[in-house]
């Protein structure tokens, strides 16, 4: 799974971890609805709008 680079960077900043670790965190977050909600909350904490969050949450 490929995640949006900005989303991975936000997770890295939030948890003060490397981008590689942040990628692993994203894998775990996307496994559950509550995890996805946590990612949305992280995006909101960094001032992202609903539209920006939708774009960030799209993965390839």
Can you annotate each of these PLM segments?
Residues 34-60:
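Long, compositionally biased
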Residues 1-33:
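Amphipathic protein-protein interaction modules
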């Amino acid at each position: 799974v490929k995640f949006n680079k900005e989303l991975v960077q936000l997770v890295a900043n939030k948890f003060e971890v490397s981008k590689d670790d942040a990628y692993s965190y994203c894998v775990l977050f996307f496994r559950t609805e509550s995890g996805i909600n946590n990612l949305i909350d992280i995006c909101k904490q960094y001032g992202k709008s609903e539209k920006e969050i939708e774009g960030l949450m799209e993965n390839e």
